[in-house]
């Protein structure tokens, strides 16, 4: 059976599922090299090498890939933070290991505003109604509040509010 080395950049359950699927392959002898946000017992048990990088720092992920580059055939990244910070660009440039995730310039999760504007341009039928509230457009917080509440009334309070920047799943209000 052909041996394949896979770098997995992990934050949580999604990447655990990837590690599980890779290590259960019946077609390949897969060895996983995991760069994890925290010590995940499942990943530790299945990884040939496991390293904890608490902030998923792109430079540290790249160093881990460099040390193991002769045994890694490709990598896959789930968490948005290292994608937004250009992990693919850096690892591919310095190691030659192909990485499955968007390049930094295509990391649409970096800005919800840019994401919505892009969707409006290419697939408007799947893009929900949205409005962007720029603080600089308002004289004070009261004017901002009044405008936001007016928009919410128009939507009958059926709305989702998101910050422009990534919030690791913690920034959404319904």
Model-assigned labels for residue ranges:
Residues 1-104:
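ATP-binding N-terminal substructure of ATP-dependent carboxylate-amine bond-forming enzymes
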Residues 105-109:
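Long, charge-dense
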Residues 8-10, 110-174:
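Active-site nucleotide/adenylate-binding loops and adjacent lid/helix of ATP-dependent enzymes
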């Amino acid at each position: 059976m052909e041996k394949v080395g896979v770098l997995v950049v992990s934050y949580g359950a999604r990447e655990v599922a990837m590690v599980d699927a890779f290590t259960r392959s019946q077609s390949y002898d897969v060895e996983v090299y995991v760069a994890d946000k925290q010590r995940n017992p499942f990943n530790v048990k299945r990884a040939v090498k496991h390293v904890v990088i608490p902030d998923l720092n792109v430079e540290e992920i790249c160093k881990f890939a460099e040390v193991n580059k002769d045994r890694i055939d490709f990598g896959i990244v789930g968490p948005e933070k290292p994608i937004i910070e250009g992990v693919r660009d850096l690892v591919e440039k310095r190691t030659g290991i192909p990485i499955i995730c968007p390049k930094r310039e295509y990391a649409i999760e970096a800005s919800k505003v840019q994401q919505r504007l892009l969707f409006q341009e290419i697939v408007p039928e799947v893009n929900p109604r949205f409005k962007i509230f720029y603080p600089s457009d308002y004289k004070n917080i009261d004017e901002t509040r009044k405008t936001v509440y007016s928009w919410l009334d128009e939507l009958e309070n059926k709305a989702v509010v998101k910050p422009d920047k990534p919030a690791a799943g913690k920034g959404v209000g319904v």
